[in-house]
Swiss-Prot record:
Extent of motif TonB C-terminal box: 896-913
Name assigned to this protein: Probable TonB-dependent receptor HI_1217
Membrane topology: Multi-pass membrane protein
Protein family membership: Belongs to the TonB-dependent receptor family.
Domain TBDR beta-barrel: 176-913
Gene3D superfamilies listed in its UniProt record: TonB-dependent receptor, beta-barrel domain, TonB-dependent receptor, plug domain
TM segment ranges: none
Segment forming the signal sequence: 1-27
Amino acid sequence: MKKAIKLNLITLGLINTIGMTITQAQAEETLGQIDVVEKVISNDKKPFTEAKAKSTRENVFKETQTIDQVIRSIPGAFTQQDKGSGVVSVNIRGENGLGRVNTMVDGVTQTFYSTALDSGQSGGSSQFGAAIDPNFIAGVDVNKSNFSGASGINALAGSANFRTLGVNDVITDDKPFGIILKGMTGSNATKSNFMTMAAGRKWLDNGGYVGVVYGYSQREVSQDYRIGGGERLASLGQDILAKEKEAYFRNAGYILNPEGQWTPDLSKKHWSCNKPDYQKNGDCSYYRIGSAAKTRREILQELLTNGKKPKDIEKLQKGNDGIEETDKSFERNKDQYSVAPIEPGSLQSRSRSHLLKFEYGDDHQNLGAQLRTLDNKIGSRKIENRNYQVNYNFNNNSYLDLNLMAAHNIGKTIYPKGGFFAGWQVADKLITKNVANIVDINNSHTFLLPKEIDLKTTLGFNYFTNEYSKNRFPEELSLFYNDASHDQGLYSHSKRGRYSGTKSLLPQRSVILQPSGKQKFKTVYFDTALSKGIYHLNYSVNFTHYAFNGEYVGYENTAGQQINEPILHKSGHKKAFNHSATLSAELSDYFMPFFTYSRTHRMPNIQEMFFSQVSNAGVNTALKPEQSDTYQLGFNTYKKGLFTQDDVLGVKLVGYRSFIKNYIHNVYGVWWRDGMPTWAESNGFKYTIAHQNYKPIVKKSGVELEINYDMGRFFANVSYAYQRTNQPTNYADASPRPNNASQEDILKQGYGLSRVSMLPKDYGRLELGTRWFDQKLTLGLAARYYGKSKRATIEEEYINGSRFKKNTLRRENYYAVKKTEDIKKQPIILDLHVSYEPIKDLIIKAEVQNLLDKRYVDPLDAGNDAASQRYYSSLNNSIECAQDSSACGGSDKTVLYNFARGRTYILSLNYKF
């Protein structure tokens, strides 16, 4: 295999030299000059002419919709919504994260790993994504499964590239300078959103230009919004709390009287036996003994004999087991009943962003340099991102089209002292850091072969390093850590709550928050494009060498010496060979079919190999790379002048099937590989959460449709996606509440490590609009549809042929993930917008989002699977008890209250001058 790979790479390199000779030989056979009239196609229409599963969205910075909604309007693309992450996390065909989706900004892979602190009842969650301000995004291109160039490096399902605004986006026509102003505000907790960008450009004598652009953006995002129907998200579940409180008071011997006051429940014997007229021949002797019984007799004397109201009886209100004390007791324990999905105050976001670019361009070369910053404060946590990038292109002839790119990205998350993660308090300031460096160089050649065959080749090399580190090892965020500052009193030592243990019994170090380590990718890639008339063949191939070095905790227990838990490192390397081939034909404007086959790989991440709930229990560097084989069949339609002279129709229909081997997911089960350590055996620590390769092949199939029609006066956009999959879940997709869990549940805490990523069964968007008064006035209506989707439950599903047996003397080995349940299809959501352009490039836009004020749930929102959607109920009725005796006296319940925004009015202004 190694010899074959080496031979392929050498052969691909020689094609460049051979092609030059062929081209020179054909030069003298040129018969005459051929005049070619190129079609001028706008960026948003180009995907309808390209033989690939690609979609584009332009002018994102002008949008009043969120960046999540923009991405979700693309068929086959979605986002993992997380109100606390501060990043844009793109999902392609149910795959998400570093290596599954190559998310880029201006062609630079984004590696930031965001981990949020706890929000209300929910534990923090983690996800990869791009830390970018949507106000700076000119457009986004999404490629699904097929690839070319550097975008195919470590990209299992595809890539998404966010393009930022440049000099020529800001300056109109040949003017020397330009300014863009954007402002947005609205109702329903829509906070301020402002951006300004200024650019200057000077034309040079050689026909080139030099320019500079600077932009500033500030945004605030509040989650304290009202859902459909007008109720605030944070207040959801008050009805459940009220019922549980009533049940709590009933158990304590109180009921509500007609005036809404708590009063003694005279049907309870401890009250009825102390009435002034109690029946002395009844079974009351036990209930009339002691000081508490005496107090009850005094209370009932005032209530029944003297006719006082309950609120005026001091002993009833302030007694040891009176109403005030019962109320305080409920308040201390009400967390177990709360189902509010988030605590809005902990997710208030305030961001400030800067963009500075320098550009030079002429007929033969282009040079660009940029600095981009983002500072985002989410609750008490801060995110800081700094991105530096240089691009250079030199194009002298058909043999020399050289591109060079270098980038340096730094991302930091600052956790304050006193913050909570998984219910555990951060003891001191904690800073996690991500540093990525990328260098990419490639050269393209264009040849004219015999038989009027055009050949274009690109040969490139990419070097990419990515490192995760922390300013200190957070020992307090460990499963068995024993420290007075984390002691929860009796709660710690009972069967409920946090584990703790001495060093002589249990390891004190875990790696659950931001595992540290370094990745290196070295990739050689080669693209070829053959064209003859209406037929085209594209083939892209790359070879990647991947090396890693990660940090984990050791455990040394030597007789006669103190137990040592050193920080150790483990390294390794893996290889992958990826290729993508597309055959297409331009049979007519109405029918341009294409067929694509691609084989792609994804390397295991540091977070998967070195996450460990305790000591080195979860470390698994033997993970195999994921491998996907995808077949796509589709066609394009691009027709100008269909019904009128200038109308344009674009259609793209794609069907696909994917087969993924060695799918990586986290599993709860047996963890040791070289024999069970003594500390684990003596404490019964047989199971933990670790990452594994899924044994069955993951299969996906689906259809994606995109239609665009524009005739000036009328326009329509349609997108629709359908998918079937047997994609497995993770064990960490849903976890018990970190601050209200039993010790058994704490062992199964997933720390927000993963979330369900399967796409809804189907989803789509339809937009219809019309333009009037020389296209100055635009009216539009958009309808969003989400079909049946999934969320993880707290219940276990056993895999690899294993099963769990209760009450056995010796537990068998088993492996578990989380079951899912369906989220029913959501109501159709309508958004109405009106925009007016009184003068050129001044656009005033008014929008009503969720026009009909529907109550709906956004699929793939982290809050859907949050622990706060599960609570303990004591309200089981007699039917439940009759069916299952274990349900008597209370049981776990689940709800889905993580609703999206209700009706919201938006007003925005965009001015370019």
